[in-house]
Amino acid sequence: MRRGLLRLAPLVLAASCGPTEPSPSPAPTATPDPCATAPSAYAKAVLDSWIPACSLAQDIYNDPTKALGAPDAGGSGPNNFTGFVSLGFGGRVTLDLGGCIADVAGPDLRIFQAVGSEPVSVYVSLSPAGPFTLVEARKECGGAYSGIRRYCDVDIASGGATQARYVRVEDGELFPCPGGTVSEGADLDAVQALAVATVGLRDPGR
């Protein structure tokens, strides 16, 4: 009899404690909305950049932050230019507009280049991690603007994109380095979101 009572004890204890509740599952982490904020008229932050070592060894215009804000390239060459970053052989800079632009009829982005008319390739993405969509491949970027500044316009729909926040500009000249200059590759001055108003924003020299 005593042995039977001992066998019943665990069952009585379990019943008194009630059913075991499963541990609650952790709430999923919300994915940030890249389009929650309004875009700036000009790129406002550098996401990443890469310039090949053989170009860095002789280029003197290597600061990717020079591609931020309104176009402001100026000065005289070869050693006294200001306001741009030389991308070097196949180099690139990826910029953040601060919010999403949506495709509209006609061009959506204006790429400002300095001094020459070297071609550029342009990619866009909604995520800093990509994937990046090619929207222009090696487009000549030499439209006259002012002073030493040149430009070319890009329609993101050319690559099938409908929205974009991050813009990657890549050298399309592809002249092997070292090339014997201090400003190898395309010289990136600024990236503009054409549908965003620029009222009150200063564009030096325009």
Predicted segments with their positions:
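Ser/Thr-rich, Proline-interspersed low-complexity disordered segments
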Residues: 23-31
